[in-house]
Amino acid sequence: EHLSLNQEGQLNMIDLNIRALTHLARHYGAEMKKKGSGRILNVASIAGYQPGPKMAVYCATKAYVLSYTRALHSELKKSGVSVTALCPGFVETGFQEVAGMELGALELSGAVPADRVAKTAVKAMRKGRREVIPGLFNKPIPYANRLVPISLNLAVVKRLMS
């Protein structure tokens, strides 16, 4: 639960996912705009499309990344600079096995290999796309979230994170 998590860790996540990302995108976005070209890739998450019990700050920061990226993409569209949000779901990195984590949720969720996520992200960024969701299983999630009641959405996410 959010209230039992280490507050310093949660604030560090906010600093990284919001403050640092905003600072870097603003700084390098301005430089790219002066040159008349450039690409920015921000790492959001499929979690940015929904609230997440047991990972409230993570989901909230990724929602910020997604919203910020969409807005910046729109602002810079005619300047030759594109901004892309990468919104992966679970990613197979090998970390889970090393950390001794259960893989049940990952296996059921259609986890995507890290190299495929990276290739998909670079391809979308080069094309100037606003956002990209790697993996067939993940693509319908934002649309499904709009169709189901928030209470059901929250229950499903809570169950997946248990």
What is the role of each PLM region?
Residues 1-4, 8-15:
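Active-site Tyr-X3-Lys motif and surrounding loop/helix of classical short-chain dehydrogenase/reductase
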Residues 25, 61:
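Active-site helix of classical SDR
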Residues 45:
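Residue(s) in the substrate-gating loop at a strand-loop-helix junction
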Residues 75-137:
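SDR active-site lid
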